[in-house]
A protein has these predicted regions:
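Active-site-adjacent beta->alpha loops and helix N-cap segments on the catalytic face
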Residues: 1-12, 89-99
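A structural motif corresponding to the C-terminal end of an alpha-helix
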Residues: 69-81
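Glycine-rich phosphate-binding active-site loops on the catalytic face of alpha/beta enzymes
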Residues: 83-89
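Beta-sheet entry/capping signal
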Residues: 18, 81-83
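Structured catalytic/translocation cores of nucleotide/phosphate-coupled proteins
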Residues: 1-4, 21, 78
Length: 113
């Protein structure tokens, strides 16, 4: 994600233009493969597909992966937010946000402002 945002800025995307990443908790390796192969622009590293494939509970692994990516995105300069998507799996979004810690970090920083 970091390299992608850096390339966008180097190419001329002004810093005042907000940039959002699209994330969601996937439920299976099959779903991850489908997104990678069928949705233009989707970046799905094979290691994430493999991790879901090998998980005892792929849906839990999907929530963990989403939480990790959300936390990582929050640390990257130039990423202003995330568009979280999971049709029919809203509880997975809520849990990924909770596990990521981003809501707690945002609340803590707003109380210091």
């Amino acid at each position: 994600m970091r390299r992608h945002v850096e390339r966008l800025r180097e190419t001329g995307l002004p810093p005042q233009v907000p940039y959002l990443v699209g994330l969601g908790p996937l439920r299976s390796a099959r779903g991850a493969r489908w997104m990678r192969d069928s949705l233009w622009g989707t970046v799905m590293p094979e290691e994430l597909v493999r991790r879901m494939d090998q998980a005892a509970d792929p849906a839990e692994a999907g929530i963990d992966i989403c939480a990790e990516l959300l936390a990582a995105a929050a640390e990257i300069p130039g990423i202003d937010g995330a568009h979280l998507m999971a049709p029919g799996h809203q509880a997975g979004i809520v849990e990924a946000v909770r596990r990521s810690g981003v809501a707690q970090a945002a609340a803590a920083s707003s109380t210091r402002a």
